[in-house]
Amino acid sequence: MAPKAEKKPAAKKPAEEEPAAEKAEKALAGKKPKAEKRLPAGKAEKSSGEGKKAGRKKAKKSVETYKIYIFKVLKQVHPDIGISSKAMSIMNSFINDIFEKLAGESAKLARYNKKPTITSREIQTSVRLVLPGELAKHAVSEGTKAVTKFTSA
């Protein structure tokens, strides 16, 4: 029995070493399957990355619009009248177009005068140049009133 006992501890020692080596290999091998498991998780991360892109798309969807302000003005002028989403979209694009025209004209005026900043004076002049007749006069008076209110507050 003594030889058997010697064989068992001797067998256990290499067996212990082998399981340790196997455990190390299994740990490495275990990491590989974990990495393989992470690949689908990576795919999930990619899909969550797409979700981030979708989040970015949502951020792009939250582009500033004038819809709230158009609606407020509509309710001031005609409290009982609503507006369709298509009409609201048209009004929003109209205001964006006017804004771009005024900004472009103001930038040209600043360049002509060799000034690095666009001031209220350039804006006022560009309003007079871009908008026709009475509309320009009303816009200038409302703009002046708004600037005065802003500076006094």
UniProtKB/Swiss-Prot annotation:
<dbReference type="GO" id="GO:0005634">
    <property type="term" value="C:nucleus"/>
</dbReference>
<feature type="compositionally biased region" description="Basic and acidic residues">
    <location>
        <begin position="36"/>
        <end position="53"/>
    </location>
</feature>
<comment type="subunit">
    <text>The nucleosome is a histone octamer containing two molecules each of H2A, H2B, H3 and H4 assembled in one H3-H4 heterotetramer and two H2A-H2B heterodimers. The octamer wraps approximately 147 bp of DNA.</text>
</comment>
<feature type="modified residue" description="N6-acetyllysine">
    <location>
        <position position="7"/>
    </location>
</feature>
<keyword id="KW-0238">DNA-binding</keyword>
<feature type="cross-link" description="Glycyl lysine isopeptide (Lys-Gly) (interchain with G-Cter in ubiquitin)">
    <location>
        <position position="149"/>
    </location>
</feature>
<dbReference type="InterPro" id="IPR055333">
    <property type="entry name" value="HISTONE_H2B_site"/>
</dbReference>
<feature type="region of interest" description="Disordered">
    <location>
        <begin position="1"/>
        <end position="61"/>
    </location>
</feature>
<comment type="similarity">
    <text>Belongs to the histone H2B family.</text>
</comment>
<dbReference type="InterPro" id="IPR007125">
    <property type="entry name" value="Histone_H2A/H2B/H3"/>
</dbReference>
<dbReference type="GO" id="GO:0030527">
    <property type="term" value="F:structural constituent of chromatin"/>
</dbReference>
<keyword id="KW-1017">Isopeptide bond</keyword>
<feature type="modified residue" description="N6-acetyllysine">
    <location>
        <position position="37"/>
    </location>
</feature>
<keyword id="KW-0544">Nucleosome core</keyword>
<keyword id="KW-0158">Chromosome</keyword>
<keyword id="KW-0832">Ubl conjugation</keyword>
<keyword id="KW-0539">Nucleus</keyword>
<keyword id="KW-0007">Acetylation</keyword>
<comment type="function">
    <text>Core component of nucleosome. Nucleosomes wrap and compact DNA into chromatin, limiting DNA accessibility to the cellular machineries which require DNA as a template. Histones thereby play a central role in transcription regulation, DNA repair, DNA replication and chromosomal stability. DNA accessibility is regulated via a complex set of post-translational modifications of histones, also called histone code, and nucleosome remodeling.</text>
</comment>
<feature type="compositionally biased region" description="Basic and acidic residues">
    <location>
        <begin position="1"/>
        <end position="28"/>
    </location>
</feature>
<dbReference type="InterPro" id="IPR009072">
    <property type="entry name" value="Histone-fold"/>
</dbReference>
<dbReference type="GO" id="GO:0003677">
    <property type="term" value="F:DNA binding"/>
</dbReference>
<dbReference type="Pfam" id="PF00125">
    <property type="entry name" value="Histone"/>
</dbReference>
<dbReference type="GO" id="GO:0000786">
    <property type="term" value="C:nucleosome"/>
</dbReference>
<dbReference type="InterPro" id="IPR000558">
    <property type="entry name" value="Histone_H2B"/>
</dbReference>
<protein>
    <recommendedName>
        <fullName>Histone H2B.10</fullName>
    </recommendedName>
</protein>
<dbReference type="GO" id="GO:0046982">
    <property type="term" value="F:protein heterodimerization activity"/>
</dbReference>
